[in-house]
């Protein structure tokens, strides 16, 4: 007698292979840029707070991605610009931040704060290549800094964050442009 029923594994595996995978659904979204994005909780912080002349901007591209762009100046002892996003985010069950970015072959910093009372941030540098990439940053690899100086404290081990930022400050005068699709936890 001919067996017309295939084992289930021979049916499910090929079907799963052709299902669309939405990488954005993996983990917890912190911010997903799109054409309707609001920048209500975003702020630009330049070296102008100390007399510098750098200028950063945040905008939305036609494709819906965010664009952090501008110019870093070393005049008047400056040399950085940043964009910051304020939101209380629980990190329970997650140990990485994923940045989906398209860069300009420059180094940037991801910066987080776990409390509004903290003067320091936890920082991790990353290289943004000129192609879309998922930058995966373990939270435990983020080191404490204050005004660019390392602190003698433990790396990040918090349960939440209240602020997330991107900063460029490579000690050279330069234009920059970093496209951001989304920021999520994994």
What are these regions (language model features)?
Residues 13-14, 39:
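N-terminal processing/targeting junctions
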Residues 14-22:
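Hydrophobic h-region of N-terminal signal peptides that target proteins for export
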Residues 2, 22-186:
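Beta-rich carbohydrate-recognition modules and glycan-binding surfaces
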Residues 1-12:
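Bacterial N-terminal signal peptides that target proteins for export
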């Amino acid at each position: 007698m001919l067996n017309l029923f295939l084992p289930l594994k021979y049916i499910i595996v090929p079907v799963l292979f052709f299902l669309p995978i939405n990488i954005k659904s993996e983990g917890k979204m912190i911010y997903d840029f799109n054409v309707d994005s609001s920048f209500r909780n975003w702020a630009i912080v330049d070296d102008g707070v100390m007399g510098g002349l750098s200028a950063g901007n945040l905008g939305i591209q036609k494709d819906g991605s965010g664009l952090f762009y501008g110019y870093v100046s070393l005049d008047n002892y400056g040399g950085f610009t940043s964009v910051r996003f304020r939101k209380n985010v629980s990190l329970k069950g997650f140990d990485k931040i994923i940045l989906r970015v398209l860069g300009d072959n420059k180094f940037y910093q991801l910066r987080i704060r776990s409390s509004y009372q903290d003067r320091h941030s936890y920082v991790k540098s990353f290289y943004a290549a000129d192609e879309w990439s998922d930058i995966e940053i373990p939270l435990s690899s983020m080191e404490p800094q204050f005004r660019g100086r390392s602190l003698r404290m433990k790396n990040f081990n918090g349960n939440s964050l209240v602020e997330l930022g991107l900063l460029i400050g490579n000690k050279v005068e330069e234009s920059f442009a970093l496209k951001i699709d989304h920021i999520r936890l994994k």
